[in-house]
Amino acid sequence: MSIIQAVITDSICVISGDSRMTNIKTNEHFGGFNKIIKLNKNIMFGVTGDPFDSSELFHGYCYYDMANGFLNSDNMFDISYDDFVNIILNRYNEMYKEHMTNKKQYDIGDIICGCNGSEFEIITISLGSTIGLPDGVMTVHKAKDFPYKAAIAGLEKHKDNFETLAQKQYFKNKEQLTIRQWKNIMQEVVDDGSKFDNTIDNNLNFETIRKIEKDGDILFK
């Protein structure tokens, strides 16, 4: 398994992924394996599970290299968040049918996040998870009366640790956390988690999207 962490607020979206690849058959590990992609100013995604399965799900939107992981394509993708999500979920539905009829078995635990045109959102996609995540797709948004919403593809203990650290920071600061503070929380999760979960390391890659208001316009970068 791997760990992908994603968090959204009113103005920022942050995603991170560890960089350890585990050969399930031999239990060998190696590093330098990228698991997150920023497709454009509105769309990011991260993958866990069997990388071949995720490369099929996101085919055409990134390269998959067995040594280096998921890499940005040379193409510039001028595609909206909603259109991208529709394409990926249509593929997922076909894979789900194959999985349920035993035509093919998948191991997917992926996250898409970004701006849907009006607000930031996170979508979790799971199929045949080896750690017991329920199959299906879940879309989450930040509640109006709460400062953030997070989703994690990984062990339940990692999720609990993230929430404990995030809420501790909010009680301490009494204000919105910065991108740097979110990155620090994610780093602390893997610093601790890599001590008991040998499928992850504490070398994180990060991608971010910021919502900026300028001269009456709303920009994303």
Regions found by a protein language model. Give the residues of each.
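N-terminal nucleophile
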Residues: 1-221
